[in-house]
């Protein structure tokens, strides 16, 4: 099996599709990085995908078919995020987004975008009761993992909680740049 990543195939994608698929790739990378199944291999893919998406998604959104570089970088970043989650798996945001999107007729990426802030906060809570049966999950690590993402993106913060909030703020700013509304109600 193989996949061909061809920028020409999505050069004319409308802004809404660019925004929804781009923020979906953000969620893919974040959930793969925070997964208890994450590895050194998936971590590298997820972090690099996030760096590229934060840099190039606003350009791909604004410039559309005139910015070949931004479209190419986004195609590669989405593929990297996909490779990360294909091996580390996804989390509760994607699970809920499937239900939310189906019920409210929302694009999948938009459904993810509407929940990602609260899911990040929920996942980062140091609640040992949430621990699963995975041997690699002997204590809560998700807050630290999100802090590592914030560090990789150069978002600053003194504590891990500060870094988490800076990451959420950066995601919210990205969503605003690409025209994603803030609430389910905003989508009717």
Segments (PLM) and residue ranges:
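Gly/Pro-rich interdomain helix-loop hinge
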Residues: 103-106, 110-188
């Amino acid at each position: 099996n193989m996949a061909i990543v061809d920028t020409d195939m999505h050069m004319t994608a409308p802004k809404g599709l660019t925004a929804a698929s781009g923020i979906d790739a953000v969620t893919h990378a974040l959930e793969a990085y925070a997964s208890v199944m994450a590895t050194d291999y998936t971590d590298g893919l997820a972090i690099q995908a996030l760096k590229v998406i934060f840099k190039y998604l606003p350009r791909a959104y604004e410039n559309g078919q005139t910015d070949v570089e931004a479209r190419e970088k986004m195609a590669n970043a989405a593929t990297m995020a996909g490779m990360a989650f294909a091996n580390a798996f996804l989390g509760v945001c994607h699970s809920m987004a499937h239900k939310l999107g189906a019920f409210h007729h929302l694009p999948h990426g938009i459904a993810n975008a509407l929940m990602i802030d609260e899911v990040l906060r929920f996942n980062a809570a140091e609640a040992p009761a949430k621990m699963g049966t995975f041997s690699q999950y002997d204590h809560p690590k998700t807050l630290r993992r999100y802090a590592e993402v914030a560090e990789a993106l150069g978002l600053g913060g003194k504590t891990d909680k500060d870094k988490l909030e800076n990451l959420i703020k950066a995601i919210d700013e990205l969503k605003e740049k690409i025209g994603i509304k803030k609430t389910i109600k905003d989508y009717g």
